[in-house]
Amino acid sequence: MNQDRLRDVFDGAFSRIALARKIVTPRLMLKEIGVIKSIGTGIAKVSGLPGTCFEEVLKFPGGYGIAFNIEEEEIGVILLGDHSHLRAGDEVERRGHVMDVPVGDALIGRIVNPLGRALDGEAPVISSRRMPIERPAPQIMDRAPVTVPLQTGIKVIDALIPVGRGQRELILGDRQTGKSAIALDTILNQKDENVVCIYCAIGQQASSVAKVVAALQENDALSYTVVVVTEGNDPPGLIYVAPYAATAIGEYFMEQGRDVLIVYDDLSHHARAYRELSLLMRRPPGREAYPGDIFYIHSRLLERATHLRPELGGGSLTALPIVETEAEDIAAYIPTNLISITDGQIYLSPTLFQLGILPAIDVGKSVSRVGGKAQRPVYRAATGELRLDYSQFSELETFTRFGGRLDERTRTVIEHGRRIRACLQQPESSPVSVSEQIILLLALTAKLFDEVPLENMGEAERAVRAVVLNIPPELLARMEANESLNDADRHALLWHASTALDGLGSAHAKA
């Protein structure tokens, strides 16, 4: 009996082995393996890989690279990691695909490098899907108009330079004028807006990145944010691919029908990294030693930001690229390139920054070319004359420095403009809600603040914002919704604002 059972076991095992031999056919795996000819700063010259495609990933001992220059005898490769251990003669293997990055919800709340490797000391990122970092931008017929506002929580931007979901709005200014602070405040304001945020640090100092991450953690913003980091001491190749990897992560969420905000901080470092790589590869230099395709590398990046049609999910990718100017020269090469690519710009003036006017946004040099159509109707009604009044004030204030005598009308315009400027000032990391902004803007347009002494403007603003707690819930709902306010609503809000300003110099009569 035992022999029969043993025979059955062996017969079953051998029959499965025979079946497996019929099904499985041994195959030879063809691999192309080349060798390193020379190593430079962040690049390598490789020979022996004739089938390599442009931007294909190559495997080095202990790291990866991307085929950047395809020549007859050799390939120029940009290295994506430490190359101090590499030597001439080391083997290089083709991977057969372009560079990709892990995408998905597993990345939210994580700090990673452009390769998807965790930098936050936690477990590796595990994702079932990867996407190539370089993808064609959506076709024209796949795009929808920008019609939904992206609230930044910054009064001067939401009122005068509105940003829409799917827009590309450039932030530019000299060093240390608050560019990153504006982008960070915008991320903080998306807390209850169901927007996935991506902060891409491009060649930044480690201390600057740590400060941003700390601010995100303190304000509980890391729970809806992905941080993609390259530091200044990273290889130029890794810095170069960082914004493309971050955009691929954002495109995944956009294609799921979600709204995404991505901040590139900053593209000046990206342009310099690309210039360094191009010069190392001996590509012909052009203006300011940048290669001839410097415009193209930024346009193909920023054109991926859009608002998709409802048939494609209706998701959006809003881009806030940052670029640094030198000595207030917004007509320099890289800034003008980006101004022409984007849908508007927010310019931060070092002069205003030195005067303590924060955020130091120069309204005269800032514009939003498509965001106005997405602005809430209640904002358009509240800010109808505000931009004109502020522009007139800025022009007249320049002439007052010459010490000439001013007529009554000019003095009125200047005093009104000073109160607009004071009311639009805002400390960092202090976003203002839609309802608070609307009542402030209505009070400014109605000139309720004109009787308030300048030194009391901070107190007056806080008093007006506090009356939001006393506004009927149905009126608050209309303010928050994308609806216009009728005359009765407007008068009710102005009455609340005027009441709050009693004792600070304002009068009921102006309401």
From Swiss-Prot:
UniProt entry tagged with the keyword Protein transport: no
Role noted for this protein: Produces ATP from ADP in the presence of a proton gradient across the membrane. The alpha chain is a regulatory subunit.
Subcellular location per the Swiss-Prot or TrEMBL entry: Cell inner membrane
EC number: 7.1.2.2
Subunit structure: F-type ATPases have 2 components, CF(1) - the catalytic core - and CF(0) - the membrane proton channel. CF(1) has five subunits: alpha(3), beta(3), gamma(1), delta(1), epsilon(1). CF(0) has three main subunits: a(1), b(2) and c(9-12). The alpha and beta chains form an alternating ring which encloses part of the gamma chain. CF(1) is attached to CF(0) by a central stalk formed by the gamma and epsilon chains, while a peripheral stalk is formed by the delta and b chains.
GO cellular component: plasma membrane; proton-transporting ATP synthase complex
Recorded catalytic activity of this chain's protein: ATP + H2O + 4 H(+)(in) = ADP + phosphate + 5 H(+)(out)
MF GO annotations: ADP binding; ATP binding; proton-transporting ATP synthase activity, rotational mechanism
Topology within the bilayer: Peripheral membrane protein
PROSITE patterns attached to this UniProt entry: ATPASE_ALPHA_BETA
Protein name per its UniProtKB record: ATP synthase subunit alpha 2
Residues that, per the record, bind ATP: 173-180
Assigned protein family: Belongs to the ATPase alpha/beta chains family.
Gene, per the UniProt record: atpA2
Top enzyme class: translocase
Feature type site, description Required for activity: 366
Organism: Nitrosospira multiformis (strain ATCC 25196 / NCIMB 11849 / C 71)
Organism superkingdom: Bacteria
UniProt keyword annotations, A-Z: ATP synthesis, ATP-binding, Cell inner membrane, Cell membrane, CF(1), Hydrogen ion transport, Ion transport, Membrane, Nucleotide-binding, Translocase, Transport
